[in-house]
Swiss-Prot record:
It is found in: Secreted. One of its GO terms (molecular function) is serine-type endopeptidase inhibitor activity. This is Serine protease inhibitor 3. Keywords: Disulfide bond, Protease inhibitor, Secreted, Serine protease inhibitor, Signal. Residues 1-17 form the signal peptide. Coiled coil: none annotated. One of its GO terms (cellular component) is extracellular region. Defends the organism against the host's proteinases. It comes from Anisakis simplex.
């Protein structure tokens, strides 16, 4: 029980820490969908995904380097 305050404090710090995302990315504690370059638009899930940085809504994840780019920069354009 001595460690309970330490665990609570650690979880609080992790939950409120500022997340550094890359260009054209934003942090979401509940991402639902991320488009990938070269894929056709697909329906988004209605449940939360793993909290992470994901591409802004108008951007696509480019494979293999993982950058978020505009649709016109995708390979099929």
């Amino acid at each position: 029980m001595m460690f309970t305050p330490l665990i609570v404090l650690t979880l609080l710090v992790l939950a409120t820490a500022e997340h550094q995302c890359g260009p054209n990315e934003q942090w979401s504690g509940c991402p639902k969908c991320e488009l990938q370059s070269g894929e056709s638009d697909k329906p988004c899930a209605t449940i939360c995904g793993e909290p992470k940085c994901y591409c802004s809504p108008d951007k696509y994840r480019r494979i293999p380097d993982g950058r978020c780019i505009r649709k016109i920069q995708c390979p099929q354009h």
